[in-house]
Amino acid sequence: MLKDGLFTRFPRPAFALSLHDDDTMPAGTIGYHPGFFRSMSDAVTITVYGRGGHAAMPHNTVDPIVLAARIVLALQTVVARENNPVDPVVITVGSIHGGTTGNVIPDEVRLQLSVRTYTADVRARTLAAIRRIAKGEALAAGAPREPQVEAPERGNAPVYNDPALTARLAGALKRGLGEDRVIEMPQKMTSEDFAEYGLAGVPSVLLHIGAVDAVKLAAARQTGIPVPAPHSPEWAPEREPTLKGAIRAEVTAMLELLRVN
């Protein structure tokens, strides 16, 4: 919408407010965090090339599946050994595609990564490390050509909740919904393109709405088995209390922002 000229075709808003469902809080509970709240995200694709052949004669091939496996493991050393632990990084390989059947070694394998960081410097170092590891492992494996690493020039920006606006809304929500229904949350490594409104100069706040039955959440904490999270096919928010809590929170926030002192 912003790229399509939202703020030139229509008046620029005084504030931007958003709600996102959450699997860590009881349904209807509101969570907030001032300052940086959600991370940057980058979608990275690595294609590694080998020399395919018969599965019974791997000595005549350069196996890109083994090469891909080495890369997957080596990437975690970026998180564990190259990055300062106080500057969080997540590298997840969420998809690997290679081959068509069990008795054929393929010519190539494609890996799809999700990379999460908070600062531009850490992001740049992490993406450079991914390229270095992919190329280094391919060289060590004797691959016939360098891997192809595709990364965006600019991924999703981090969500920054305007501290003054966050404090104002948190106070209004606590008065309207109750102190026990509004809690301060830690930062998360998930991302959200709502950040673009803040980058456009609009004071903005992203709030979370708990969407899990309180009894189920308590049981999950007791057993250590987490409830299904967003992006899981089993994610099923408690509809009525979640919607009611979200509506009450939005209305309360709107009334606060529209209030004339």
Question: Over which residues does each language-model region extend?
Answer:
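Histidine/acidic-residue-rich, glycine-tolerant segments that coordinate divalent metal ions
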Residues: 1-96, 100-106
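Metal-dependent amide/peptide-bond hydrolase catalytic core
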Residues: 69-261
